[in-house]
Amino acid sequence: MLPMAILPNGDRWCHGCRQRYLRSRFPIFSVDGSRTLPTCPYKWPNGQGDVAKFLQGIENRDLWEKEHGQIYRIWSGMKSEVVLTQPSHLQAVFRDSNKHSKAENNNSGYLMSELLGQCVGLVSRERWRTLRAVTEIPFQHDKMPSYLELIQRHTRHHFDRLLASGDLRQERIHPAQDLKMLPFWVVAEIFYGECDAEMKTELQQLCVLREDLFKRMIQGGIVRWQWSKYLPTATNRALAEFQRRWRAFNQRAYDRACQQQRILPIVLMIEAAREGSTSVEQIYQTIDEALFANLDVTTGGISWNLVFFAAHSDIQERVRQEVLSATDHDAYLLSSSTLLAACISESARLKPLAAFTVPQSAPTDRIIGGYNIPAGTNLVVDTYALNIRNGFWGADSQCYRPDRFLEHRATELRYQYWRFGFGPRQCMGRYVADLVIRTLLAHLVAHYELGWVEPDPGKNSTWQRDLESWITIPDLQLRCVQRRND
């Protein structure tokens, strides 16, 4: 007798069974019980995650919202995720975000668990509070003045190298590729102190290994399942090599700091783990999150600013004059009320780092958009709907106008704008990220003039992005001419 899956219409039968099973396992009804929540069809094996949600999220979010409305459901693997698109949805959900739980392994499965499943960004409740207390100290707001010299030094040296051996010699710059490693080395020095040549070589090699593993994780499939760890695959071999070398690197960095009698974050974190407040693996994965996982994140945050400056020479010149007229340069870089800071916020508004946020769940039932969402249901935010399609931003919401951020107080933007998250679980590295971006852009506009290689840049929605990256980053070159007074 032939298996059902290879009988005529067998695939359709299996598909229908999966749909019915998932809807019965994760039932969501309207408040009056007359309707079920609109839901994207489950597609074996990944559902709408992670390729459809991240790599293709910008295009898919439009299609899904048009088909299903302002609140609907997608599947990440076989996990239910409810998509929120309106500020009113966020008000109902995030009022107690400190009590929320992040989705286990980001709903991405086994390989993600081995890379980041225990990092501070993905654990919840008491585990999160304990780990955050151990790891957040070097990233607190009051530490930023002490990093100014470090960040400015790395910025100068990075541009010197680009001028000596990069395309900058030909007055060209690729914002993502050419600036990718600058924030990486800044964060590495915060954790480990100034890295010697051997440490830099090992970190660069680990970057390549880690990037390949993350790309494989995004593709999903077999690496979602726990049993895949027993298979003799290239992915498992690469994972074992990365974990072995990453643990060894951090142990050597710890030993080096102890020998030098330096109280660096790597020392404080590992000693906290050895005292039992957290685990060494949680520390390693949290450093991984800050260095490797956030490599693309910070690259995206930096690089779109250059593209917008190239397309808007008037704004670029205004920022340049602001930079040159600052009487206290350090205070200027630390300020959040400058045109420079507004430009960074506006770039992040128009080019959110990802189309959907990391899934998390509320501890109690919520009524959202006329539906009763049970406690523990994973929720994600459509960042384009919030940052661009939101009526709060006015008729010019799709236009680049940084001054809009000088017209609103920060409290007015709550639930209207997504960048680093919401509430106490906002990104731990947000202050360092902002300081790196401000320093880089201030250096750039003071010493270089950005322009478009092509005569007509077109609309920002048509600018080429890297289609292989889970983060929205540009894939294009700009004209970058050193100013004559330099």
From Swiss-Prot:
A molecular function GO annotation: iron ion binding
Cofactor(s) the protein needs: heme
SUPFAM superfamilies for this protein: Cytochrome P450
Record's keyword terms, sorted: Heme, Iron, Metal-binding, Monooxygenase, Oxidoreductase
Known EC number: 1.-.-.-
Annotated family: Belongs to the cytochrome P450 family.
Function field: Cytochrome P450 monooxygenase; part of the gene cluster that mediates the biosynthesis of aspirochlorine (or antibiotic A30641), an unusual halogenated spiro compound with distinctive antifungal properties due to selective inhibition of protein biosynthesis, and which is also active against bacteria, viruses, and murine tumor cells. The non-ribosomal peptide synthetase (NRPS) aclP is responsible the formation of the diketopiperazine (DKP) core from the condensation of 2 phenylalanine residues.
Name of the protein this chain belongs to: Cytochrome P450 monooxygenase aclC
GN (gene name): aclC
